[in-house]
A protein has these predicted regions:
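Ordered, amphipathic secondary-structure segments that act as subunit-interaction surfaces
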Residues: 74, 79-93, 99-100, 123-124
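Residue-level signature of catalytic and energy-coupling elements of molecular machines
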Residues: 27, 88, 133, 210
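Generic N-terminal amphipathic, Lys/Arg-enriched alpha-helix
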Residues: 1-17
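Flexible, glycine/charged-enriched surface loops at secondary-structure junctions
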Residues: 39-43, 200-209
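Translation machinery proteins
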Residues: 24-86, 107, 113
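Long, charge-patterned amphipathic alpha-helical coiled-coil/hairpin "stalk" segments used as oligomerization
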Residues: 93-201
Length: 210
């Protein structure tokens, strides 16, 4: 099998053995030694969970605020009215509205990374499932994007958070920062992701989980 030049350089990193298992701190230290590319790469971790995603009571989904952030600028849209809309604006949401935001989305507008809605606004948002679902933008209580506490949700989204969801193979892929972050920042982000996954373990899941 032919290997890319980048792969060969990575294998040649001092102290790295592709056949060996490493602890989290050691793995992060090695990751930062790998030759990079011309942009600030995202560090991502993958977990194989001991769940059966075919069973509705074994879905794993959630979100967690990352203490060191994500290193990305996030555009937040909020569907709310009244006091909740004012709270969202004060918290720094990029787009805030009610029927007007919903109508914009219906017309194809998706110039945002996270959509937050109050519970009473979901009657307007639910019909947008076909447009929002494929991009993972549909608000969901499990990820904290359907909430009355819109101010907190906006601030958390702006500060940096990671969403996770097990796929059909029970795998979860979660970004936990940029390679430009120092090792302690990446480790702190990694640790809170693991804690969140443990808390999200379905009660019906048996045996080894992570």
């Amino acid at each position: 099998m032919r290997r890319s030049k980048l792969y060969k350089k990575q294998v040649e990193v001092e102290g790295f053995d592709p056949q060996q298992r490493y602890g989290v701190a050691e793995a992060i230290a090695l990751l930062k030694k790998f030759p990079g590319v011309k942009f600030d790469q995202t560090a991502e971790v993958a977990f194989k969970l001991g769940v059966d995603p075919r069973k509705s009571d074994q879905t794993v989904r959630g979100a967690v605020a990352l203490p060191a952030g994500t290193g990305k600028s996030v555009r937040v849209a909020v569907v709310a009215d009244g006091a909740a809309a004012a709270e969202a604006k004060e918290a720094g949401a990029d787009f805030v509205g009610f029927e007007d935001v919903v109508e914009k989305i219906k017309s194809g507008w998706q110039d945002f990374d996270i959509l937050i809605a109050t519970p009473d606004a979901m009657r307007l948002v639910r019909p947008l499932g076909r447009q929002l679902g494929p991009r993972g933008l549909m608000p969901n209580p499990k990820t904290g994007t359907v909430t009355d506490q819109v101010g907190n949700a906006v601030r958390e989204a702006k500060a940096g958070r990671a969403e996770f969801r097990a796929d059909r193979g029970a795998c979860v892929h979660v970004p936990f920062g940029k390679l430009s972050f120092d090792e302690n920042a990446l480790k702190s982000n990694f640790d809170v992701i693991v804690d969140a996954l443990v808390k999200a373990k379905p009660q019906t899941a048996k045996g080894a989980y992570i």
